[in-house]
């Protein structure tokens, strides 16, 4: 049997798995125990569902046992009905009505409360995971694809819900039914029941082998589903690039490859699931057949010809023995659900246990002038050194442009200023205070960011501009920010003005319009330090001119750190910092650097883009 199971291939495809970094996987029992602890506050739902299941199963088992007294006492000699047996039959009828009523009540109670428990588990886990994602460091999102993370939030939680609802109720309900049927079998014939116990260890061995196979298959399926989600999300997000570069077939092949692997894993799970029940049924049928031979041979005592097995006990025993196959089958099937849930639980707890963004500071600055000092800053991604000994002094109100070739460390530097990453050496001071000594919330409250790749939300213009502000923002404030960002003119022309939904990531707007909405958002926040990753190289001349005017309006009232790509930006900057290979190689004003004839001169002559 083990060889048959081993033929179901369990090879993994080396796909990305969020829990792949866990060197020692927690044991199934520990994971399941922790899973139940997550919903311990819902114990009353589980208790009521369990009580309902017990009533349901006890009523079912009792009705099977009624076969015994009905056959033994409900009929007179020769199979006829006597006055006494008629009374017994009527009592049995009343008893069956009562048992059916108990069964119905138990069914409703168990299904209602276990369904409620399942929905509460979905709600709790998705809420906890989403809340956790809000506090995870940038390194987490660098390591894991969007599709993988979304798959964990949606698909994995559904798998866990099955374990805490369907699986639990099946274990309790069918487990109770099995116990009840075993009691019926022992009461009907303890001799035959003892014989059936022999099969227990064989079933246990078979199920333990199946458990391991299911767990491996489930883990592979969880991972491959994440890859499918990621590829689909990537395709939808980048549909323009895919079509322009004629990569439809390549992207389709990538998606189909991941889908094929997921399909193969699911088919293997189905095959293993389909194999489990027939094997158990074959074992059980062989035992029942052997029992019949035993009864035929040893069913009577040699002395007086009396039997240790009456017609009623025989019928109730075999009715119970036949009925026990279905709950046993259900209990073996629930193993599939549990193993899927265990694999899903690993990834969910991986996210929930992932170290949050480090909060190293406790200080808070109520007001900031905007002086930024960078001293001997060094940083590396693993073995790859990105910044080395960077020192820059930025006075309040200055506009400092960072220029350099791609990969010179400009964007990484701004990420460290925002503390999305923490430097390995050196320090960054904000008004003389090390940024690591400030709370993350306080530090970031003094910063505004306008990204090269503008990020807008599928919401109204108003909500995008007032995004993140804890105070109430009036329409007048939003309109003022739009005017200063040279955006109010086109917003007025939208169907609902500032209350117009702009689509996914501002898809209903042009590139220049999206830039200006982003600038208006920074204007409304009015932070003393602005980080601007310039992207005007992607705009037409008119849009560039309007965005430049909006940027000038924004930089008048704050310290501005610009990752510059345009000549007009560097020409007007108070200071230019030239970076190469993660180091500052030149620093000064535009004309001074041109006269030096170094890297800046070459970048300037090439247009800086």
Curated annotation (Swiss-Prot):
Domain notes: In MsbA the ATP-binding domain (NBD) and the transmembrane domain (TMD) are fused.
Described purpose of this protein according to its UniProt entry: Involved in lipopolysaccharide (LPS) biosynthesis. Translocates lipid A-core from the inner to the outer leaflet of the inner membrane. Transmembrane domains (TMD) form a pore in the inner membrane and the ATP-binding domain (NBD) is responsible for energy generation.
Membrane topology: Multi-pass membrane protein
Enzyme Commission number, as recorded: 7.5.2.6
Pfam families per the UniProt record, alphabetical: ABC_membrane, ABC_tran
Protein name in UniProt: ATP-dependent lipid A-core flippase
GO CC field: plasma membrane
MF-aspect GO terms: ABC-type transporter activity; ATP binding; ATP hydrolysis activity; ATPase-coupled lipid transmembrane transporter activity
Gene3D superfamilies with a match to the protein in the record: ABC transporter type 1, transmembrane domain, P-loop containing nucleotide triphosphate hydrolases
Residues covered by the ABC transporter domain: 372-606
Residue stretches in coiled coil: none
Quaternary assembly: Homodimer.
Occurrences of domain ABC transmembrane type-1 (ranges): 47-340
Location relative to the cell: Cell inner membrane
Main location: membrane
Family, as annotated: Belongs to the ABC transporter superfamily. Lipid exporter (TC 3.A.1.106) family.
TM annotation in the entry: 47-67, 88-108, 167-187, 190-210, 279-299, 305-325
Binding residues for ATP: 404-411
Species of provenance: Francisella tularensis subsp. holarctica (strain LVS)
Catalytic activity: ATP + H2O + lipid A-core oligosaccharideSide 1 = ADP + phosphate + lipid A-core oligosaccharideSide 2
Keywords (A to Z) from UniProt: ATP-binding, Cell inner membrane, Cell membrane, Lipid transport, Membrane, Nucleotide-binding, Translocase, Transmembrane, Transmembrane helix, Transport
Enzyme superclass (EC): translocase
